[in-house]
């Protein structure tokens, strides 16, 4: 029988051999590639992504028009106008825009010059307005819109924006005709850390607004977002209810409402302009929130709304995520609409 030390030595040699083999295997493996994390999308990236359908329609037709040869000089501007109308810029706005482009470029311009002129004119129409920073406390925002435009969701996302800026937010569930709207605001209140004033379904909306203003003052909140019932813009009696809420808010908080935002669905195209005019005549809208821009090729309606109503675009929605509702920036919007394309038509358009 072999001595014990021989067995121990053999086991030790086996262990050392295994360790050596494993070490050699590790050395022979290629180093793992380190993949850098992609940077988060910028606001312009999100807009560009949301406007892809509009951009493809508008720039696709624009490029086709600008690719015309010298013999087609007289057709370029009428077809340019048709391309803008197809993107829901609107007949009147498209006509005025093309007239200004023609006045700037004339018959001697090339494709690049016309494209740049269209871009500049769109930027000029959209202007440089941005949502005003709250200057009063509480800063009261009344939110209006017909059913189905995403009004209550917009209020939740506005609460998230203000909360991210360090503001204390109170939401008022003034849409008492829909129990689901009250419950939905409750979910958004929990999600954003906002406070909520609510009553049961069927309660008087003006009474809920009254409670909301009293609570806002007592609690010292910074921003109050007041939901209202969705209604057809052609129903006079329902519009009178909105005016009553507005009077209650103004009586309880000096200077309120400080903003009256109308939420419009971009997919409705030119009908959104009719809604904006009617609500403005009845209530006095101060700004537009345009939702669902990511779901339509009719995003040119942004230009038409701004031009034909004179109302500033305050926010745009380009997706379902909370941060896909962004303060409107005319420069970012124009860049997303015109600069995210395939490079555009090249060469001379006119002789």
Task: Cite the ranges covered by each PLM segment.
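Feature marks short, highly hydrophobic, charge-poor N-terminal signal-anchor/signal peptide-like helices
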Residues: 1-13
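Cytosolic-side junction of a single-pass transmembrane alpha-helix
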Residues: 16-31
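Short juxtamembrane segments adjacent to a transmembrane helix
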Residues: 27-49
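Primarily NTPase-proximal linker/entry elements flanking Walker-type ATP/GTP-binding cores
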Residues: 41-226
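Conserved catalytic-core segment of NTP-binding enzymes
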Residues: 184, 204-219, 233-344
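Structural recognition of the conserved hydrophobic beta-strand(s) that form the central parallel beta-sheet
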Residues: 225-227, 263-264
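Short glycine-rich anion-binding loops that position phosphate/pyrophosphate groups of nucleotides
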Residues: 229-231
């Amino acid at each position: 029988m072999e001595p014990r030390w021989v067995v121990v030595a053999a086991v030790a040699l086996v262990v050392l051999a295994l360790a050596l083999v494993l070490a050699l295997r590790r050395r022979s493996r290629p180093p793992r590639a380190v993949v850098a994390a992609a940077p988060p999308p910028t606001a312009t990236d999100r807009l560009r992504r949301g406007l892809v359908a509009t951009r493809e329609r508008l720039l696709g037709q624009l490029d086709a028009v600008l690719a015309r040869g010298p013999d087609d000089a007289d057709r370029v501007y009428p077809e340019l106008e048709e391309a803008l109308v197809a993107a829901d810029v609107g007949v009147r706005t498209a006509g005025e825009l093309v007239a200004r482009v023609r006045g700037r470029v004339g018959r001697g311009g090339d494709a690049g010059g016309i494209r740049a002129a269209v871009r500049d004119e769109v930027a000029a129409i959209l202007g440089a307005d941005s949502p005003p920073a709250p200057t009063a406390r509480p800063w009261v925002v009344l939110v209006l819109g017909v059913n189905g435009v995403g009004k209550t969701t917009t209020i939740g996302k506005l609460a998230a924006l203000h909360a991210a800026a360090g503001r204390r937010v109170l939401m008022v569930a003034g849409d008492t005709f829909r129990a689901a709207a009250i419950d939905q605001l409750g979910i958004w209140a929990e999600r954003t850390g906002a406070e909520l004033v609510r009553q049961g379904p069927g309660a008087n909306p003006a009474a809920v607004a009254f409670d909301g203003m009293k609570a806002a003052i007592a609690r010292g909140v910074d921003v109050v977002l007041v939901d209202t019932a969705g209604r057809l813009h052609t129903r006079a009696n329902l519009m009178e209810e909105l005016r009553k809420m507005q009077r209650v808010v103004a009586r309880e908080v000096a200077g309120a409402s400080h903003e009256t935002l109308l939420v419009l669905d971009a997919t409705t195209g030119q009908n959104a302009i009719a809604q904006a005019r009617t609500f403005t005549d009845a209530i006095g809208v101060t700004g537009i929130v345009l939702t669902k821009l990511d779901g339509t090729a009719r995003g040119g309606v942004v230009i038409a709304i701004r031009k034909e109503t004179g109302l500033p675009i305050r926010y745009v929605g380009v997706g379902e995520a909370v941060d896909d509702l962004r303060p409107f920036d005319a420069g970012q919007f124009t860049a997303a609409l015109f600069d995210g394309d395939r490079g555009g038509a090249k060469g001379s358009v006119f002789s």
